[in-house]
Amino acid sequence: MSLFFRFLLRFLLRVLYGYKVFGGECQKTEGPVILTVNHSSWLDGIFLYASLGTDWKFVTSSPTAKLSWLHKKFVYNKWTVPIEPASAFELKRLAEILSKGGKLVIYAEKTISTNGELMKTQAGIHFLIQKTNAKLILGYLRGARYIKGAVCHPGNSRWFPRVTLHLKICKELTGNLHSPSQNKESHIMTENRRAIWLRDRMLAHHLEVNLEYGPQTLPHVARYMCGLAKKVCIWEDFKYTRITYRKLILGASLIGGVLKKMLKPSEDGRVGFLLPGVAAAPVTLLALWSIGKVPTILNFSAGIKTICDCTRLSKIKQVVTSRSFIEQIHFDVKALAEIGVEMVYLEDVRPQISLFAKIKNLIFCKCPIPKGITAQSTAVILFTSGSEGMPKGVELTHRNLIANCEQAVPFANVADSYKIFNALPIFHGFGLMLGVIIPIVRGIRCFIYPSPLHYKIVPGLVYDTKSTVIASTNTFLNGYAHYAQPSDFSSIKLSIVGGEKLQPSTIKNYADRFMTLVEEGYGVTECSPIISVNTTYDYKPGSVGRPFPGMQVQLKEVPGITNGGRLLVKGPNVMKGYLNKEANDAFKALNGWYDTGDIATVDEDGFITILGRVKRFAKISGEMISLTAVEDTLKEALIELGSELELAVSSVNCEDRGEALVVVTNNKQVTDEKVRTIIRESGLSNLCTPRNVMLMDALPRLGSGKIDYMTLKKILEGSSAQN
């Protein structure tokens, strides 16, 4: 009777939810074995019961039985092991069951997820594995988070979404998580490490499944998400133009249809893209993807010479832009025309959209999928900041961008109901991920603003839009803090800084004035762009967090540097390659690894601490000195000067010692004597003492807000030569 009922239940779930099990052979694993699975909805137990054999027992929570008579039936029956979560003795009882060859199903989380993502995992699962030598099966109920009426989060949901169960035997059960000390603090650390150990493996499994079984390209993702939540608003701009999935698909289809006729054949389908952060930008990007074009996103703040160099490098012949935007920024169109680049204006597209096309797309609202597009097809070309020379063209595939989104959102625990405020430009890798990719792939609403430099306007908009996530650079956050009222950031739940070092003064300022914890992340354009981030689950001050699931890191020894090494990373978010031949050959020689060019340390828990760029080291009297370390030491000691302090450390040639350090600042209170005292009291080597302090009204900066060290060094070298 039990087998017949399970068969009937499986059939019903297949009809309603398209339910399938992948990796079902794992359930035949001999005990002792634990199956741990994400807990997304009230129906999770029914899906698992229909899939597993009668030899599996479900660990249930006794207090849940008090909710109703139906809950009591589910908690107390012959297939369950009810436990009291607050009792430490229950782990011993579970260990006894496993020791006898038992097979237990334990949810990775103690409760149903309240945000749709994997929440805090149970440390006791790893304890049971170590105690009983039990095997571990990782389970992922994909799609259960969208079941309307059965979830506990306010995010996207619908009736009868597709649900699948993916099982995988976890082979990586090693790890020294026992603390040698028996004090309370070390016990808490061990418990935390056990919980993080399980969460890492669960998230890595989720990533593998989503990349293999989910939509493979961004047009496929848009089509899938439109079917799931077509009325959900995913973009809003400063003109309060709102874009839902349905409007996105309609707009992309109509614009794409006209652009297909206007755009000429080009190298690998590349076409220039020059638009600010407005609602039309992501719609135009999807329009280009839907007709098989590769947007080459140009940095309009880089200067016309650099833009011309980028167009030559990418071999583009046309640039999609807006006439009003070109006029607003006084862009030199003639310079591009002289090298054979034509401007295609969106204002000329709308009149060419026929009534028939509008009616057709209203009836058949589906995102077009171009022929031949795959996960490995190039999705966008971005250009590096050029902080160390000529910008390099970076090819990012659909798989790269989707993977980085699927890594970042669950790792940082960003819920569907959150609202992102993004003022970073789309030509910036972080701005593209936050402002375009995450809203498309995850349906998380984003307010996009065209400039991060409007320090007086941005704080008020964050308050007005009730945004919960903001990502920026240290420089921009300091600018906002100068004009913001204490209530402006009251709705912020997650504030992330990347692109440059997060300063202690910024952390203190936001904690004291806005009661907001600013967390530091790390990324590079070549990694789509995010590599690691600190989170509320996993935080270490001074570090840039731990690498995302699916990423590998290694340190390569650098002659002369004893603390740390050159950071190399590998993962599904690492780029396809460079457009620059020399740089691309060097990348391909590393067999999938990417050399970040940063010197870093990685501790036993995996936290990465960036010590500085390889090129940000000076060789003084034969010793390698980190300019970043000296700069950070000075900024930390001068925290009382406030967030308006601009300070950088660079090096110039020196006949006596090879190189000498120079401090450049905008504050007259930073004197030679004060700097020498700080270095002496900090315990740094005497070789770290700067030769002199140079005053400058404003330090040169890149479009991303980072200090332009290359230009700064040229200024210092010119000044040194004159002296």
What residue ranges belong to the model's regions?
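AMP-binding/adenylate-forming catalytic domain of the ANL superfamily
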Residues: 228, 346-347, 645, 659, ...
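AMP-binding/adenylate-forming catalytic core of the ANL superfamily
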Residues: 319, 565, 571, 576-577, ...
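Conserved AMP-binding/adenylate-forming
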Residues: 258-302, 423-425, 624
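A cross-family acyltransferase "interaction/gating" segment
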Residues: 23, 70, 103, 114-180
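Conserved AMP-binding/adenylation subdomain of ANL enzymes
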Residues: 402-419, 427-469, 483
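Conserved pre-ATP/AMP-binding loop-to-beta segment of ANL
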Residues: 230, 343-383, 390, 413-419
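Conserved ATP/PPi-binding loop(s) of AMP-dependent carboxylate-activating enzymes
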Residues: 543-550, 559-590, 623-625
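Gly/Ser/Thr-rich phosphate-binding loop
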Residues: 346, 358, 467-471, 481-540, ...
